[in-house]
Amino acid sequence: METQAIVRGVRLSCDKGRLVADLIRGKKVGLALDILTFTQKKAAGIIKKALESAIANAEHNDGADIDELRVTSIYVEQGATLKRFSARAKGRGNRISKPTAHIYVTVGN
């Protein structure tokens, strides 16, 4: 039995999110939460909230035992890019791109 949590449109580069997601893929949820708690990256806090949501979904909707849950799959996909403008000298301008990401976390036995 698998349960999923999805976080969309997070202001995070998908490459930076994938670095953290690779740390917890396949681990038990208790160990994964500990890893995320002590990982000093912005993505760790965001992925931790998504994992906690998936755990709560599994417990509430399926009546799953938290001690037996594992992170069966986690992946971070690229979302829409916010394009911004930065004024430069002599009437020019540069484009600033602010990437977003979608995070998918699945927990199961």
Swiss-Prot record:
Please provide an example of a Pfam family that matches this protein in its UniProt record: Ribosomal_L22
Instruction: State the UniProt keywords alphabetically.
Output: Ribonucleoprotein, Ribosomal protein, RNA-binding, rRNA-binding
Outline what the protein does. This protein binds specifically to 23S rRNA; its binding is stimulated by other ribosomal proteins, e.g. L4, L17, and L20. It is important during the early stages of 50S assembly. It makes multiple contacts with different domains of the 23S rRNA in the assembled 50S subunit and ribosome.
Does the UniProt entry include the keyword rRNA-binding? yes
Any one Gene Ontology biological process term?
Answer: translation
Give start-end of the signal peptide.
none
HAMAP family, per database record? Ribosomal_uL22_B
Q: Which SUPFAM superfamilies match?
A: Ribosomal protein L22
Q: What organism does the UniProt record list as the source?
A: Leptothrix cholodnii (strain ATCC 51168 / LMG 8142 / SP-6)
* Cellular-component GO terms for this entry: cytosolic large ribosomal subunit
Query: What family does the entry list?
Result: Belongs to the universal ribosomal protein uL22 family.
Name-wise, this protein is Large ribosomal subunit protein uL22
Q: What domain of life is recorded for the organism?
A: Bacteria
Q: Does the keyword Ribonucleoprotein apply?
A: yes
A GO molecular function held by the record = rRNA binding
Self-association state and partner proteins as the record states? Part of the 50S ribosomal subunit.
Matching entries from Gene3D superfamilies are given as: Ribosomal protein L22/L17 (3.90.470.10)
